[in-house]
């Protein structure tokens, strides 16, 4: 007899920069959430949808849980904690190449309270000697009775299929919540903003990334079938604006070039990308600015 179709919501949690977005992109087999080596890249809770013949798994990609330093940080933590409500399972990600720290313990204590099966996913196994992985497993396994332990490399795909296989075992029969071809709940404008923000994170220095907000002001299809997109990058200081623009506009041109290529792949159309940089002092601590940029409480 054919097994019933299964579905469920799975929170992906961990401290900043353990590879949550990279893992989800690998599972979905398409880039849905932005990836950067800067911590706390993901700012909103994002639904990412995996559908196959047997199940539909809705992953909740969350901001890395951390001690907030401003209103934006508190919003990010709230988004991460809210993902732990009404879920069917959780993936607790840790990094194989880093020692267990207070941040990992803080996240684990939060996810334990959700009362659902929790899988320990040890990411970045490509960065360590394979002989060291059993010790990492033993270190975390003493802390909690995990539903399963899965060492993976989200970067190169090692063991990633095991994640979905293990989730299928514990999910209950349920409906398809989303169409087969839907992979995220994020609108195109937000995806465009996130692509630009990702390229900016990669192109700028350490002092800029977390002071940046990117907002897509306009998306209009022109007569020549080219999509005109106007994006505004907000920073907090004039010095940051100069860094983003670069000498003779070189940095901004680089950001625009790489972002345009990816946006054209997303939209399937030629794109004219118009990026502006503006200063909005201390926007991360201003509720009105956070709401304007889409960081709103649910």
Predicted segments, located by residue:
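Conserved G1/Walker A P-loop phosphate-binding module
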Residues: 1-89, 94
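Conserved glycine(s) of the Walker
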Residues: 19, 159, 251
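Active-site glycine-centered loops adjacent to acidic/histidine catalytic or metal-binding residues
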Residues: 61, 123, 153
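Canonical P-loop GTPase G-domain recognition
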Residues: 117, 126-184, 188
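Catalytic P-loop NTPase motifs of RecA-like helicase/translocase cores
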Residues: 42, 65-67, 99-100, 128-129, ...
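Conserved C-terminal guanine-recognition region of P-loop GTPase G domains, centered on the G4
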Residues: 50-56, 75-149, 203, 220-223
């Amino acid at each position: 007899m054919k097994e019933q179709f299964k579905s469920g919501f799975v929170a992906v949690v961990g401290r900043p920069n353990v590879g949550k977005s990279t893992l989800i992109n690998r599972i979905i087999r398409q880039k849905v959430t932005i990836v950067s080596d800067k911590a706390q890249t993901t700012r909103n809770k994002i639904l990412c949808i995996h559908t196959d013949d047997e199940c539909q798994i809705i992953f909740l990609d969350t901001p890395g849980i951390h001690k907030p330093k401003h209103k934006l940080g508190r919003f990010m933590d709230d988004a991460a904690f809210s993902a732990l409500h009404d879920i069917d399972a959780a993936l607790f990600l840790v990094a194989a190449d880093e020692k267990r720290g207070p941040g990992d313990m803080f996240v684990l204590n939060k996810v334990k309270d959700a009362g659902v099966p929790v899988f320990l996913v040890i990411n970045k196994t490509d960065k360590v000697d394979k002989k060291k992985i059993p010790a990492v497993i033993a270190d975390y396994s003493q802390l909690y009775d995990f539903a399963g332990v899965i060492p993976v490399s989200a970067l190169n795909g090692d063991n990633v299929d095991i994640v979905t296989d293990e989730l299928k075992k514990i999910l209950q029969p349920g409906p398809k919540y989303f169409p087969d071809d839907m992979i995220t709940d994020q609108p195109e404008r937000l995806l465009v903003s996130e692509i630009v923000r990702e390229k900016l994170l990669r192109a700028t220095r350490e002092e800029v990334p977390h002071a940046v907000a990117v907002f897509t002001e306009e998306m209009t299809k022109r007569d020549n079938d080219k999509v005109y997109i106007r994006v505004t990058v907000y920073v907090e200081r004039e010095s940051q604006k100069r860094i983003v623009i670069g000498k003779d506009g070189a940095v901004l041109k680089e950001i625009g070039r790489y972002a345009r290529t990816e946006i054209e792949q997303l939209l399937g159309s030629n794109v004219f990308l118009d990026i502006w940089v503006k200063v909005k002092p201390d926007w991360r601590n201003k509720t009105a600015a956070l709401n304007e940029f889409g960081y709103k409480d649910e």
